[in-house]
């Protein structure tokens, strides 16, 4: 390791380490088509050991989208299965926990009311036949509180970085043209009910927020181009979707909800001139402007995610989220690893998606339950899930391990970085907020593939079996030194340049002193100044807890994980470093809910 002399932005001379990646260890996890390995750690390898074959070059200087998360949906069916399993806590730990067996799922797309995987059909505002409730006086989430919401709360306690999205399959029957939750008779939202439907969705976001489940993303209709005959759904034209979004955005803002709206939430179909093609989301984006944050996509039908890139290129400031795809056989490990791992997950991520979301999280041995005494559902999905429950038995299917190759190693806020595809080895790479690198590779071919991975001039070799998937991780960052600037260009500052324990940390006019010279250490996610650590006072976790300088002690109060949006996240509290009050000099910093606003954006050295 060599040392070089650099200047901080304040002109202070600093000694900065530069890293050579020769001999750097690479950790490997492997899943094989024959099930001999299931996300199994392999013997570490190292850069500099050489290799042969085509070269995958991982380039951290070419960056793309930041990651929101990986997961699926705790549908009514999924929640019912997990809730009633004697292994409930173990299942939840394995899905959302960060322990050795947990895969740290970080994204959940939740139905607003019923979906096609529900034990009964219901909305959040049901009234009797022939009645209506435009005042929404009968709105209630009581059915969700039986087992869905408790599991969502448990999931968030296991992974505080979990992001929630909401999606309605149907408006309440009294708002629809066929007066039914089903999609029969080309069911649609009644013209003129767009405003009350927007209020209905706003009340959903408020009610879930009150339960400690913030809805970060919301679409207004699941698969709006498809009117299902035997389960809830409804058609919605681009024009009507635009009207709903333009009503909903100000309603959410007035209700204090920091919720982003997504257009479409339907398939990757990309047949020019054949409805629905890319014109649907483009029409909505054009008609709604800043009210729509992005586009949600499903991986069915054409199974070609290039439509994501086409719409992203036309509207480059918008988010792309892949929000649903399911497989039909949990026992087809070769097909599942390729279909869900390469064709869905990797390809979606290489086409700008910030999420990978499969469908149901857990189903029973019959692929359900779907209804309880209601009409027979024919949803065309002989679906499996990451988890199968069968009485006291629990099976973790191929989808579980495929998701784990991403969610366990690619953290929210990670940036996708450039990597090239070689032969049958499809792949995607990321730089995490702690600057570690994760490369996920999937050999879609029928024979083993030998290749090299090159990073910053060093390389290693690997042979990936046919139909197998591997995740490679290695430390990618180096210690950084300099100023940390925040809102209105003010610097993070140790008050009075006092190195004593409990000295407040504030924002202050940048002056180039040592009180504003910080060390950002990616190896342990600490931030130092004057020989001590940035610290949450008393190790507390509540909103508004002050931030101070304190002797470094290795506790969670001193862990700060940089996020892709510029925030500094404290995992122990589940909150972010916040410039209290919005940017006046001498304002003390605190921790607060991560709203990702200007008060929480920091420019690191």
Segments (PLM) and residue ranges:
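Conserved residues at the C-terminal ends of beta-strands
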Residues: 73, 111, 221, 298, ...
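Secretory targeting and sorting signals
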Residues: 1-22
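Lectin-like carbohydrate-binding module/patch detector with strong preference for beta-trefoil
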Residues: 478-605
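Residue-level detector of short, conserved catalytic/binding motifs and their immediate flanks
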Residues: 54, 68-70, 103-110, 162, ...
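Substrate-binding and catalytic surfaces of secreted/luminal carbohydrate-active proteins
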Residues: 23-60, 164-166, 199-217, 227-480
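Short acidic/His/Gly/Ser-rich catalytic and metal-binding motifs that mark active-site loops
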Residues: 117-121, 172-179, 224-229, 271-274, ...
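Soluble non-cytosolic domains of exported or imported proteins
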Residues: 85-86, 142-146, 191-199, 235, ...
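N-terminal catalytic cores of secreted or lumenal carbohydrate-active enzymes
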Residues: 35-215, 236, 246
């Amino acid at each position: 390791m060599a040392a070089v002399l650099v200047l901080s932005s304040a002109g202070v001379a600093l000694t900065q380490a530069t890293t050579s990646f020769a001999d750097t260890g690479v950790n490997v996890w492997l899943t094989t088509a024959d099930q001999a390995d299931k996300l199994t750690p392999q013997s570490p390898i190292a850069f500099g050991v050489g290799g042969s074959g085509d070269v995958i070059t991982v380039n951290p200087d070419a960056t793309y989208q930041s990651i929101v998360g990986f997961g699926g949906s705790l549908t009514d069916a999924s929640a019912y299965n997990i809730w009633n399993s004697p292994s409930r806590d173990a299942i939840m730990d394995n899905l959302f926990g960060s322990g050795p067996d947990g895969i740290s799922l970080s994204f959940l797309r939740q139905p607003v009311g019923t979906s096609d995987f529900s034990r009964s059909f219901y909305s959040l505002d049901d009234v009797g036949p022939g009645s209506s409730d435009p005042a929404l006086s009968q709105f209630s989430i009581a059915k969700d509180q039986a087992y869905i919401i408790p599991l969502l709360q448990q999931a968030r306690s296991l992974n505080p970085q979990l992001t929630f999205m909401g999606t309605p399959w149907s408006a309440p029957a009294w708002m629809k043209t066929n007066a039914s939750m089903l999609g029969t008779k080309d069911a649609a939202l009644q013209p003129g009910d767009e405003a009350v439907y927007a209020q209905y969705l706003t009340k959903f976001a408020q009610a879930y927020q009150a339960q400690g489940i913030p809805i970060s993303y919301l679409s207004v209709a699941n698969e709006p181009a498809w009117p299902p005959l035997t389960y809830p759904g409804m058609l919605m034209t681009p024009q009507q979707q635009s009207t709903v979004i333009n009503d909903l955005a100000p309603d959410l803002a007035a209700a204090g909800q920091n919720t982003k709206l997504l257009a479409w939430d339907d398939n990757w179909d990309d047949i020019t001139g054949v409805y629905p093609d890319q014109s649907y989301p483009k029409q909505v984006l054009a008609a709604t402007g800043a009210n729509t944050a992005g586009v949600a996509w499903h991986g069915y039908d054409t199974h070609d995610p290039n439509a994501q890139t086409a719409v992203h290129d036309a509207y480059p400031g918008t988010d792309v989220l892949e929000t649903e795809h399911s497989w039909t056989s949990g026992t087809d490990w070769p097909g599942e690893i390729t279909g869900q791992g390469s064709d869905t997950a990797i390809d979606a991520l290489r086409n700008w998606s910030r999420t990978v979301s499969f469908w149901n999280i857990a189903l029973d041995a019959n692929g359900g339950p779907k209804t309880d005494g209601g009409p027979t559902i024919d949803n065309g999905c002989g679906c499996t899930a990451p988890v199968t429950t069968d009485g006291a038995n629990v099976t973790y299917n191929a989808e579980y391990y495929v998701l784990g190759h991403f969610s366990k190693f690619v953290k929210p806020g990670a940036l996708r970085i450039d990597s090239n595809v070689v032969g049958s080895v499809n792949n995607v790479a990321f730089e995490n907020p702690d600057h570690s690198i994760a490369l996920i590779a999937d050999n879609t071919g029928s024979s083993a593939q030998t290749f090299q991975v090159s990073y910053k001039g060093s390389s290693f070799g690997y042979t990936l079996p046919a139909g197998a998937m591997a995740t490679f991780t290695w430390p990618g960052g180096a210690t950084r030194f300099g100023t940390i600037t925040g809102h209105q260009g003010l610097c993070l500052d140790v008050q009075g340049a006092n190195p004593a324990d409990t000295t407040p940390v504030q924002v202050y006019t940048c002056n180039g002193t040592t009180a504003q010279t910080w060390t950002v250490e990616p190896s342990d996610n600490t931030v130092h100044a004057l020989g001590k650590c940035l610290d949450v006072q008393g190790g507390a976790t509540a909103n508004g807890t002050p931030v101070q300088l304190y002797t470094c002690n290795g506790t969670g109060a001193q862990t700060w994980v940089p996020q892709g949006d510029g925030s500094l996240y404290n995992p122990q509290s589940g909150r972010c470093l916040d410039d209290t009050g919005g940017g006046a000099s001498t304002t003390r910093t605190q921790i607060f809910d991560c709203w990702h606003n200007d008060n929480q954006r920091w420019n690191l050295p």
